[in-house]
Regions:
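Glycine- and Gly-Pro-enriched alpha-helical subdomains that act as flexible
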Residues: 98-101, 108-127
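Charge-rich, low-complexity amphipathic helices
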Residues: 61-69, 107, 111, 122
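Signal for well-folded cores of large energy- and translation-related assemblies
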Residues: 47, 89-94, 120, 124-127
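Short, well-ordered alpha-helical segments
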Residues: 40, 79, 83, 113, ...
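C-terminal regulatory domains involved in ligand/effector binding and gene-expression control
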Residues: 1-80
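Conserved interaction-surface patches within small, structured recognition/assembly domains
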Residues: 73-109
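Glycine-rich loops and low-complexity Gly/Arg-rich segments
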Residues: 53-57, 81-86, 123-127
Length: 127
């Protein structure tokens, strides 16, 4: 009988990053996860810590090969929040990892390029 050992990269603990863009504040939290249900529990707690935030966008990657993923923009324009977060996770070849980002709106619209940059940078700082 042969046994294979799968190897993958993940985060070993929880970490945070804060990014400010104009007057908006983006707080990102990265954390290890075993499954989607665990991600939902952790992300919900994170969101509850920031009840005044305008959005909580996220992405997660699961599976030894990182073949299961999800990204969510939570009301931001399509593709401007969840996908940049997912790209940051993928850029490090991580799996069994989730990143959630809350945004405190500062009164100035950032536009699609600004949102893409800000959510991606917040995720990078957390990872």
């Amino acid at each position: 009988m042969t046994m294979s050992i799968e190897r993958y990269r993940t985060v070993t603990g929880t970490s945070e990053g804060i990014h400010r863009e104009l007057a908006s504040k983006f707080i990102a939290r990265a954390f290890p996860i075993a499954n989607e249900a665990e991600f939902k529990r952790i992300a919900e707690r994170f969101g509850n810590e920031h009840p005044a935030s305008r959005h909580m966008c996220y992405a997660w990657v699961l599976g030894d090969a990182g073949d299961h993923h999800r990204a969510n923009d939570d009301g931001e324009p399509s593709g401007t929040a969840g996908l940049p977060i997912l790209r940051r996770i993928r850029s490090l070849d991580l799996t069994f990892c989730g990143v959630a980002v809350v945004r405190y709106f500062g009164g100035t619209l950032l536009g699609k390029p600004g949102l893409i940059q800000a959510y991606g940078e917040a995720a990078r700082l957390a990872l």
